[in-house]
Amino acid sequence: MTDDKPTLVSQLAGAGLDRREARWLVEEFYDDPVALEAAQKRRLSGEPLQYVLGHWPFRSLDLDLDERVLIPRPESEELVDVALTELAKNDAVTPLLLDVGCGSGAIGLSLLAELGNRGLRASLVALDVSPDALALSRENARKHQLHAVTFVASDWFSELDPSFRGRFDLIVANPPYVSEVAFTELDPVLSYEPRDALVAPDASGVGGFADVQRIIRDAPQWLGPSGVLVLEHGYDQGEAALRACRDAGYRDVRDLEDLAGHPRVLVARP
Protein backbone atom coordinates (compact mmCIF):
# COMPACT_ATOMS: atom_id res chain seq x y z
CA MET A 1 0.00 0.00 0.00
CA THR A 2 1.26 3.50 -0.78
CA ASP A 3 0.62 7.14 0.07
CA ASP A 4 -2.10 7.62 2.68
CA LYS A 5 -3.70 4.22 2.27
CA PRO A 6 -2.48 2.90 5.65
CA THR A 7 -3.97 5.95 7.33
CA LEU A 8 -7.31 5.41 5.62
CA VAL A 9 -7.29 1.75 6.62
CA SER A 10 -6.67 2.72 10.24
CA GLN A 11 -9.49 5.25 10.11
CA LEU A 12 -11.95 2.70 8.77
CA ALA A 13 -10.82 0.10 11.28
CA GLY A 14 -11.21 2.66 14.04
CA ALA A 15 -14.78 3.24 12.90
CA GLY A 16 -15.58 -0.42 13.46
CA LEU A 17 -14.58 -2.27 10.29
CA ASP A 18 -12.51 -5.42 10.33
CA ARG A 19 -9.00 -4.31 9.38
CA ARG A 20 -8.73 -6.73 6.47
CA GLU A 21 -12.06 -5.56 5.10
CA ALA A 22 -10.99 -1.95 5.58
CA ARG A 23 -7.92 -2.67 3.45
CA TRP A 24 -10.05 -4.17 0.70
CA LEU A 25 -12.38 -1.16 0.67
CA VAL A 26 -9.49 1.28 0.51
CA GLU A 27 -7.91 -0.62 -2.38
CA GLU A 28 -11.23 -0.71 -4.24
CA PHE A 29 -12.36 2.88 -3.71
CA TYR A 30 -9.12 4.78 -3.03
CA ASP A 31 -9.55 7.10 -6.00
CA ASP A 32 -13.11 8.05 -5.02
CA PRO A 33 -13.43 9.34 -1.43
CA VAL A 34 -17.21 9.70 -1.74
CA ALA A 35 -17.56 6.08 -2.86
CA LEU A 36 -15.22 4.96 -0.07
CA GLU A 37 -17.34 6.70 2.55
CA ALA A 38 -20.50 5.19 1.08
CA ALA A 39 -18.91 1.73 1.05
CA GLN A 40 -17.90 2.13 4.69
CA LYS A 41 -21.47 3.01 5.68
CA ARG A 42 -22.91 0.12 3.69
CA ARG A 43 -20.58 -2.39 5.31
CA LEU A 44 -21.10 -1.02 8.82
CA SER A 45 -24.86 -1.32 8.28
CA GLY A 46 -24.39 -5.06 7.73
CA GLU A 47 -24.48 -5.31 3.94
CA PRO A 48 -22.31 -8.22 2.74
CA LEU A 49 -18.78 -7.23 1.77
CA GLN A 50 -19.17 -8.93 -1.62
CA TYR A 51 -22.04 -6.60 -2.54
CA VAL A 52 -20.23 -3.53 -1.24
CA LEU A 53 -17.16 -4.32 -3.35
CA GLY A 54 -19.32 -5.29 -6.32
CA HIS A 55 -17.26 -8.33 -7.19
CA TRP A 56 -15.74 -11.40 -5.55
CA PRO A 57 -13.43 -14.26 -6.61
CA PHE A 58 -14.86 -17.69 -7.29
CA ARG A 59 -12.24 -20.24 -8.28
CA SER A 60 -10.41 -18.71 -11.28
CA LEU A 61 -13.03 -16.04 -12.02
CA ASP A 62 -13.58 -12.60 -10.53
CA LEU A 63 -17.37 -12.34 -10.63
CA ASP A 64 -19.43 -9.17 -10.58
CA LEU A 65 -21.93 -9.48 -7.74
CA ASP A 66 -24.84 -7.49 -6.38
CA GLU A 67 -28.17 -8.00 -4.66
CA ARG A 68 -29.66 -9.56 -7.80
CA VAL A 69 -27.96 -12.87 -7.01
CA LEU A 70 -26.92 -15.12 -4.18
CA ILE A 71 -23.32 -14.76 -3.02
CA PRO A 72 -21.46 -17.94 -4.12
CA ARG A 73 -20.48 -20.16 -1.17
CA PRO A 74 -17.29 -22.19 -0.64
CA GLU A 75 -19.41 -25.36 -0.87
CA SER A 76 -20.19 -24.44 -4.46
CA GLU A 77 -16.48 -24.47 -5.29
CA GLU A 78 -16.50 -28.08 -4.10
CA LEU A 79 -19.48 -28.68 -6.37
CA VAL A 80 -17.40 -27.56 -9.35
CA ASP A 81 -14.59 -29.94 -8.36
CA VAL A 82 -17.02 -32.85 -8.22
CA ALA A 83 -18.58 -31.88 -11.55
CA LEU A 84 -15.17 -31.76 -13.25
CA THR A 85 -14.23 -35.16 -11.84
CA GLU A 86 -17.49 -36.76 -12.94
CA LEU A 87 -17.42 -35.14 -16.36
CA ALA A 88 -13.92 -36.50 -16.97
CA LYS A 89 -15.35 -40.03 -16.73
CA ASN A 90 -17.49 -39.37 -19.81
CA ASP A 91 -14.54 -38.70 -22.16
CA ALA A 92 -16.57 -36.04 -23.99
CA VAL A 93 -14.40 -33.74 -26.13
CA THR A 94 -17.21 -31.23 -26.70
CA PRO A 95 -19.28 -31.60 -23.52
CA LEU A 96 -22.69 -29.95 -23.30
CA LEU A 97 -23.40 -28.54 -19.85
CA LEU A 98 -26.58 -27.32 -18.18
CA ASP A 99 -26.44 -24.99 -15.16
CA VAL A 100 -29.90 -25.11 -13.58
CA GLY A 101 -30.56 -21.91 -11.63
CA CYS A 102 -27.35 -20.21 -12.70
CA GLY A 103 -27.56 -17.07 -10.54
CA SER A 104 -24.33 -15.10 -11.00
CA GLY A 105 -23.01 -17.81 -13.33
CA ALA A 106 -20.39 -18.86 -10.80
CA ILE A 107 -20.74 -22.61 -11.28
CA GLY A 108 -21.46 -22.89 -14.99
CA LEU A 109 -19.00 -20.22 -16.10
CA SER A 110 -16.26 -21.69 -13.90
CA LEU A 111 -16.83 -25.08 -15.50
CA LEU A 112 -16.75 -23.56 -18.97
CA ALA A 113 -13.53 -21.67 -18.26
CA GLU A 114 -11.72 -24.57 -16.62
CA LEU A 115 -12.74 -27.08 -19.26
CA GLY A 116 -11.48 -24.65 -21.89
CA ASN A 117 -8.16 -24.47 -20.06
CA ARG A 118 -8.01 -28.27 -20.39
CA GLY A 119 -8.49 -28.05 -24.14
CA LEU A 120 -12.14 -29.13 -24.18
CA ARG A 121 -14.64 -27.24 -26.34
CA ALA A 122 -17.52 -27.19 -23.90
CA SER A 123 -20.84 -25.43 -24.41
CA LEU A 124 -23.08 -24.21 -21.61
CA VAL A 125 -26.80 -23.66 -21.28
CA ALA A 126 -27.45 -21.45 -18.25
CA LEU A 127 -31.02 -21.06 -17.07
CA ASP A 128 -32.66 -19.09 -14.30
CA VAL A 129 -36.19 -17.95 -13.54
CA SER A 130 -34.90 -14.50 -12.50
CA PRO A 131 -34.33 -12.00 -15.35
CA ASP A 132 -32.05 -10.03 -13.02
CA ALA A 133 -29.89 -13.06 -12.33
CA LEU A 134 -29.65 -13.88 -16.04
CA ALA A 135 -28.60 -10.30 -16.78
CA LEU A 136 -25.76 -10.47 -14.27
CA SER A 137 -24.70 -13.91 -15.47
CA ARG A 138 -24.50 -12.52 -19.00
CA GLU A 139 -22.35 -9.66 -17.72
CA ASN A 140 -19.97 -12.13 -16.09
CA ALA A 141 -19.77 -14.21 -19.26
CA ARG A 142 -18.85 -11.11 -21.26
CA LYS A 143 -16.37 -10.01 -18.61
CA HIS A 144 -14.46 -13.27 -18.94
CA GLN A 145 -14.99 -13.63 -22.71
CA LEU A 146 -16.88 -16.88 -22.34
CA HIS A 147 -18.96 -16.99 -25.49
CA ALA A 148 -20.18 -20.59 -25.73
CA VAL A 149 -23.18 -19.88 -23.49
CA THR A 150 -26.91 -19.93 -24.18
CA PHE A 151 -29.00 -18.15 -21.55
CA VAL A 152 -32.58 -19.29 -20.97
CA ALA A 153 -35.29 -17.72 -18.80
CA SER A 154 -36.92 -20.77 -17.27
CA ASP A 155 -38.49 -22.10 -14.09
CA TRP A 156 -36.14 -25.07 -13.87
CA PHE A 157 -36.61 -27.17 -17.03
CA SER A 158 -40.01 -25.81 -18.08
CA GLU A 159 -38.84 -23.47 -20.88
CA LEU A 160 -35.85 -25.47 -22.05
CA ASP A 161 -35.91 -26.23 -25.78
CA PRO A 162 -37.10 -29.84 -26.31
CA SER A 163 -34.22 -30.35 -28.75
CA PHE A 164 -31.93 -30.60 -25.71
CA ARG A 165 -33.65 -33.74 -24.39
CA GLY A 166 -31.20 -36.60 -23.93
CA ARG A 167 -28.16 -34.48 -24.83
CA PHE A 168 -26.51 -33.04 -21.72
CA ASP A 169 -23.27 -34.57 -20.51
CA LEU A 170 -23.62 -32.74 -17.20
CA ILE A 171 -26.45 -31.08 -15.33
CA VAL A 172 -25.23 -29.08 -12.36
CA ALA A 173 -27.48 -27.36 -9.85
CA ASN A 174 -27.31 -25.47 -6.58
CA PRO A 175 -31.03 -24.85 -6.00
CA PRO A 176 -32.74 -23.20 -3.04
CA TYR A 177 -32.98 -25.70 -0.19
CA VAL A 178 -33.58 -23.70 2.99
CA SER A 179 -37.00 -24.16 4.59
CA GLU A 180 -39.23 -21.26 5.62
CA VAL A 181 -38.71 -22.17 9.27
CA ALA A 182 -34.93 -22.45 9.00
CA PHE A 183 -34.70 -19.16 7.13
CA THR A 184 -36.04 -17.26 10.14
CA GLU A 185 -33.19 -18.66 12.24
CA LEU A 186 -30.35 -17.78 9.85
CA ASP A 187 -27.87 -14.91 10.06
CA PRO A 188 -29.71 -11.60 9.43
CA VAL A 189 -27.09 -10.72 6.81
CA LEU A 190 -28.89 -13.18 4.51
CA SER A 191 -31.76 -10.69 4.32
CA TYR A 192 -29.65 -8.79 1.78
CA GLU A 193 -29.65 -11.75 -0.61
CA PRO A 194 -32.57 -12.69 -2.90
CA ARG A 195 -34.87 -14.78 -0.77
CA ASP A 196 -36.07 -16.91 -3.68
CA ALA A 197 -32.49 -18.08 -4.26
CA LEU A 198 -32.34 -19.47 -0.72
CA VAL A 199 -35.80 -20.64 0.35
CA ALA A 200 -37.81 -23.50 -1.13
CA PRO A 201 -41.12 -25.11 -0.15
CA ASP A 202 -41.15 -28.32 1.84
CA ALA A 203 -41.74 -31.61 0.03
CA SER A 204 -42.11 -35.26 1.05
CA GLY A 205 -42.01 -34.21 4.69
CA VAL A 206 -38.59 -32.57 4.30
CA GLY A 207 -38.06 -28.86 4.87
CA GLY A 208 -36.95 -26.87 1.82
CA PHE A 209 -36.79 -29.98 -0.37
CA ALA A 210 -39.22 -29.13 -3.20
CA ASP A 211 -36.74 -27.74 -5.73
CA VAL A 212 -34.13 -30.42 -5.07
CA GLN A 213 -36.81 -33.08 -5.53
CA ARG A 214 -38.07 -31.53 -8.75
CA ILE A 215 -34.61 -31.37 -10.31
CA ILE A 216 -33.87 -34.98 -9.37
CA ARG A 217 -37.20 -36.05 -10.87
CA ASP A 218 -36.90 -34.16 -14.16
CA ALA A 219 -33.17 -34.30 -14.93
CA PRO A 220 -33.02 -37.83 -16.43
CA GLN A 221 -34.97 -36.90 -19.57
CA TRP A 222 -32.38 -34.19 -20.34
CA LEU A 223 -29.24 -36.23 -19.69
CA GLY A 224 -27.35 -38.04 -22.43
CA PRO A 225 -26.46 -41.75 -22.28
CA SER A 226 -23.40 -41.08 -20.11
CA GLY A 227 -24.73 -37.92 -18.53
CA VAL A 228 -24.51 -37.12 -14.83
CA LEU A 229 -26.43 -34.91 -12.42
CA VAL A 230 -24.33 -33.10 -9.80
CA LEU A 231 -26.51 -31.30 -7.29
CA GLU A 232 -25.93 -29.49 -4.01
CA HIS A 233 -28.54 -30.00 -1.28
CA GLY A 234 -29.07 -29.17 2.37
CA TYR A 235 -26.97 -30.91 5.00
CA ASP A 236 -30.09 -32.64 6.38
CA GLN A 237 -31.56 -33.66 3.01
CA GLY A 238 -29.22 -36.49 2.09
CA GLU A 239 -31.55 -39.40 2.83
CA ALA A 240 -34.45 -37.70 1.06
CA ALA A 241 -32.26 -36.99 -1.98
CA LEU A 242 -31.17 -40.62 -2.21
CA ARG A 243 -34.78 -41.75 -1.87
CA ALA A 244 -35.86 -39.35 -4.62
CA CYS A 245 -33.14 -40.78 -6.87
CA ARG A 246 -34.39 -44.31 -6.30
CA ASP A 247 -37.94 -43.20 -7.10
CA ALA A 248 -36.73 -41.53 -10.31
CA GLY A 249 -34.88 -44.67 -11.46
CA TYR A 250 -31.24 -43.57 -11.26
CA ARG A 251 -28.89 -46.53 -11.45
CA ASP A 252 -25.69 -45.00 -10.01
CA VAL A 253 -26.06 -42.65 -7.04
CA ARG A 254 -23.61 -41.27 -4.48
CA ASP A 255 -23.93 -38.53 -1.89
CA LEU A 256 -20.63 -36.85 -1.07
CA GLU A 257 -19.73 -35.04 2.14
CA ASP A 258 -18.59 -31.43 2.28
CA LEU A 259 -15.53 -30.20 4.20
CA ALA A 260 -17.60 -30.11 7.38
CA GLY A 261 -18.51 -33.78 7.03
CA HIS A 262 -22.14 -33.21 6.02
CA PRO A 263 -23.81 -34.96 3.05
CA ARG A 264 -23.89 -32.17 0.49
CA VAL A 265 -23.28 -33.09 -3.16
CA LEU A 266 -25.41 -35.66 -4.94
CA VAL A 267 -23.91 -37.45 -7.95
CA ALA A 268 -26.47 -39.43 -9.95
CA ARG A 269 -26.58 -41.21 -13.30
CA PRO A 270 -29.84 -42.55 -14.77
Residues covered by each model-derived region:
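Conserved AdoMet
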Residues: R20-E86
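Conserved beta-strand segments of alpha/beta enzyme cores
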Residues: D62, S123, A148-T150, R251-R254
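Conserved SAM/SAH cofactor-binding pocket of Class I
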Residues: E78-T184, R214
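Mobile active-site "lid"/loop adjacent to the S-adenosyl-L-methionine
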Residues: P176-D211
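Class I S-adenosylmethionine-dependent transferase superfamily signal
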Residues: L111, V189, I215-A219
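C-terminal beta-strand of the catalytic ATP-binding
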Residues: Y177, R269-P270
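Non-catalytic nucleic-acid substrate-recognition regions in nucleic-acid-modifying enzymes
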Residues: M1-R19
